Amino acid sequence: MAKKALVNKANKKPKFAVRAYTRCQRCGRPHSVFRKFGLCRICVREMAHAGELPGVRKSSW
């Protein structure tokens, strides 16, 4: 889990727009966040396997 202070800091509006960054809404991870879901790759994988993300399927080719 991310530190609560860093999660709160990310939620605040920054002084300059370029300083804003995305964090996972579920665990607070700052890297590898999917904008479409607002989740990190790990949480997307866990939720997709559990069937909690509608419209997401395991690819096969």
UniProtKB/Swiss-Prot annotation:
GO terms for cellular component: cytoplasm; small ribosomal subunit. Zn(2+) binds at residues 24, 27, 40, 43. Its cofactor is Zn(2+). It comes from the Bacteria. Pfam families: Ribosomal_S14. Binds 1 zinc ion per subunit. One of its GO terms (biological process) is translation. InterPro entries: Ribosomal_uS14, Ribosomal_uS14_bact, Ribosomal_uS14_CS, Ribosomal_uS14_sf. GO terms for molecular function: rRNA binding; structural constituent of ribosome; zinc ion binding. Transmembrane segments: none annotated. Keywords: Metal-binding, Ribonucleoprotein, Ribosomal protein, RNA-binding, rRNA-binding, Zinc. The keyword Iron-sulfur does not apply. Part of the 30S ribosomal subunit. Contacts proteins S3 and S10. Belongs to the universal ribosomal protein uS14 family. Zinc-binding uS14 subfamily. Binds 16S rRNA, required for the assembly of 30S particles and may also be responsible for determining the conformation of the 16S rRNA at the A site. This is Small ribosomal subunit protein uS14. It comes from Rhodococcus erythropolis (strain PR4 / NBRC 100887). The lineage of its organism: Bacteria, Bacillati, Actinomycetota, Actinomycetes, Mycobacteriales.
